[in-house]
Amino acid sequence: MVAMILRQKVVSDPLRCGRLSQLRPFGHNCSRSILTQSRTYDDALHKLSLIASNRRITSMFDQKSASASHSNLNAQAIPEMLTSLRQAGYAPEDLASIRHIHVAGTKGKGSVCAFATSLLLQHKDRLYGTAVGTYTSPHLISPRERIAVDGQPVEKDVFTEAVFEIWDRFTEVGKTEMGLSVEDAEGAASKPFYFRFMTILAWHIFLKLGIRDVVMECGIGGEYDATNILPPANVSAAVITQLGIDHVAMLGDTVEKIAWHKAGILKSNATGFTRNLSQQPEVMEVLRQRAAEKQGQLVEIDDALVEGWGGVQGNLKGDFQRHNQALALLAVKQHLDLDADPKSTLSNVSSDEARGLQAARLRGRCEVVSQEDITWYLDGAHTNESLEQVATWFKQSTPPDAQSILIFNQQERDASHLLAHFLSCMDRPTAFSHALFTRNEQTKAEDAQDTSVQAAAAGKMAEMAPECQTAVFNNIQDTVAEAKRLARETGGRVLVTGSLHLVGGVLQALEPGSVS
């Protein structure tokens, strides 16, 4: 009853300074400077840009230090997130009105979230609320893409108001509890790092809007992820998508170690769903052990069952998507308290469910944009496995003898290694007449930028495809302009891959001001 009273306060009285200062109207003891600041959408985006980036946090794991230090950083993550939630005026029990489909994995998380959201929209009569909330990351163009309502980025005015509400709560705590100066408290010093802030912001918005059905994607890992402060009762279904090597410093250097982290989202009262990796028995054993440890049920979906079903052709391309569709179908069935048996579910997909799978959209993943007689193929793949899928998709989507333009970058991983693996999967070294390598900055910076990563990738391209002409750029706008010029001369096809940040920048260049 207490939690329900507090939760109602959150919805009806969102402009408050925080639980620690007791529930009270916004403005009580809040500084005059807070009340007189400009509070437009652009101001909200500027505030978010000041917060410590996720990269600054993950770089702490990249530093050469004892593994014990890494363990300590991981162990601190959940307590720190709980503290941040409390500073924002909430406690985990305030989330009790929301039922979550929680998704972790190395690849396919975004696709599963898109499919699950679209499926829930086909079942609106069975929802626990009136709308579907979705929280994903990263964004491609605008931060509000991360927080969606009924499959669309949250409205600008709702987003703007919510950013400042949460910002002010942390500011007040910075002054009253952290002993910061007014200037520091009103800035980024009193705020959690970006992903934690956005996660709290998402819950704040969902609670304000009365949303009770949410699809939530983990950021990195699972066990220590900011989203994993959810009480077990608030998770209706957990999904572990395809696993692979990524974020090694944080999660470990083997798939088994990474599986341990991902399976951290399994809960005692929630059924978990995953693909039965018959070729990786060691990985499956880790997942099963973790399910037993968490006292949760793990449903393993056999590939033969999914292949026999065949999936639904829709906006999200690629044969591999049938596995993501199956996971989403089962998770949604479980969320809605329907029969979630894999065999019966996949053999009895309704027309509404088929429409939901077909209609699902996820920008920047196997996306095709046609503009000015040029076809742009965009996928933010950034691991060996996902680049293999991009190669398959691109070969299936273009004539066998066609030449195209490649735009590639990967700023945080071994770009040359990833490029080489991708080219080996393309089978045909002459697939690209030109390859453009760029940093992820949108426009040209005043200061000189380090393009050594791009130069090394261009060298690898010249080594593996000597006939391909290469060029290095320090910004996306110039790269897109050159790609347009070249594409008009060489058949009008451009493939953009290697990084979601790159894909987002290219989309922004192609569609200025676009979000959804």
Question: Model segments located where?
Answer:
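Membrane-proximal helix-turn-helix segments that form the acceptor-binding/catalytic region
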Residues: 259-266
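Short functional linear segments
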Residues: 2-105, 111-124, 135, 178-182, ...
